[in-house]
């Protein structure tokens, strides 16, 4: 059998990207608008006391990863699609502008590229369309992927595929970030969360995403703006990049102030192992300039 030279191949095989506040800046205002819509939904549709809503909204987000997951865990009953439509349907998407620089950067990457987000598929489609990034990703792992409704079909008209799954995630020891949110059934291979929604920063959500995307976590980089998500991703075995931060938090291998800085901070995405070694050698042993004489 002929041996295969792996030195000319990139170090990484897949790049997983969070979407909101990662592919675009927090300063867009969508995050704040989304929070206001959630608070309004809690007040108008769930009858929660107005004075309790702001703190409750934030506390549930911190505890469960999303306010929606927290509300479900507390026993509030509502339709998932209706909730997403209320929260995202009125967002000021016009504040998002095409990002040709990021588009060029993404298209230049030789690896598979997949979105991994807690958001629903309609929101994903709107955001990627506004940013002009519809054809930059192979697929999307979204809310419906990890929490499939009775009827969930792939949508291919967007230029990317919404990934689906019927896998069962085997339980592993969860990080301290999410231990308190899960019941592990000893008699079964299936891990059943107390909350009826599977989402980041659950380590199981990352394990599910790894299986759905069919990737090797040791050869996959995960980009996210959330320190909790980064910590969970590291527990799941992924390489991690915190986006929008100046400090390398626990679990982060690299911190970027902006997603636009990927090439400077992570040249190995574009370089093969052989090219990276050559570049490092040049830095360690720069060529010595030779003085030449010109006779005229």
Go through each PLM region and give its residues.
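Asp-based, Mg2+/Mn2+-dependent phosphohydrolase catalytic module
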Residues: 1-12, 107, 121-296
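N-terminal helical cap/lid subdomain that shapes the substrate entry/recognition surface
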Residues: 2-17, 22-100, 111, 120-122
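Conserved short hydrophobic patches within well-ordered secondary structure
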Residues: 34, 38, 42, 116, ...
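Structural motif corresponding to alpha-helix initiation and N-cap regions
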Residues: 99-103, 203
């Amino acid at each position: 059998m002929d041996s295969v030279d792996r030195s000319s191949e990139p170090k990484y095989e897949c790049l997983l990207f969070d979407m909101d506040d990662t592919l675009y800046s927090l300063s867009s205002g969508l995050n704040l608008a989304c929070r206001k819509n959630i608070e309004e939904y809690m007040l108008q549709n769930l009858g929660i006391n107005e004075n309790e809503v702001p703190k409750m909204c934030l506390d549930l987000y911190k505890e469960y990863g999303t306010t929606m997951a927290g509300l479900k865990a507390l026993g509030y009953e509502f339709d998932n699609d209706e909730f997403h439509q209320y929260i995202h349907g009125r967002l000021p998407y016009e504040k998002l502008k095409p990002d040709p620089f990021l588009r060029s950067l993404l298209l230049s990457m030789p690896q598979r590229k997949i979105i991994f987000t807690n958001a629903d598929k309609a929101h994903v489609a709107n955001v990627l369309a506004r940013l002009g990034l519809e054809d930059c990703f192979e697929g999307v792992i979204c809310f419906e992927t990890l929490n499939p409704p009775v009827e969930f079909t792939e949508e291919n008209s967007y230029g990317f595929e919404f990934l689906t799954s019927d896998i069962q995630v085997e339980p592993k020891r969860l990080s301290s970030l999410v231990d308190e949110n899960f019941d592990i059934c000893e008699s079964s291979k299936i891990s059943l969360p107390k909350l009826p929604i599977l989402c980041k920063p659950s380590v199981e959500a990352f394990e599910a995403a790894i299986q759905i995307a069919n990737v090797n976590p040791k050869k996959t980089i995960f980009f996210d703006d959330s320190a909790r998500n980064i910590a969970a991703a590291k527990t799941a075995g992924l390489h991690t990049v915190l986006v929008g931060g100046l400090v390398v938090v626990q679990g982060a291998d690299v911190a970027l102030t902006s997603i636009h800085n990927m090439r400077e901070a992570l040249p190995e995405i574009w370089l093969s192992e052989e090219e990276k070694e050559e570049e490092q050698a040049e830095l360690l042993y720069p060529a010595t300039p030779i003085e030449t004489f010109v006779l005229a």
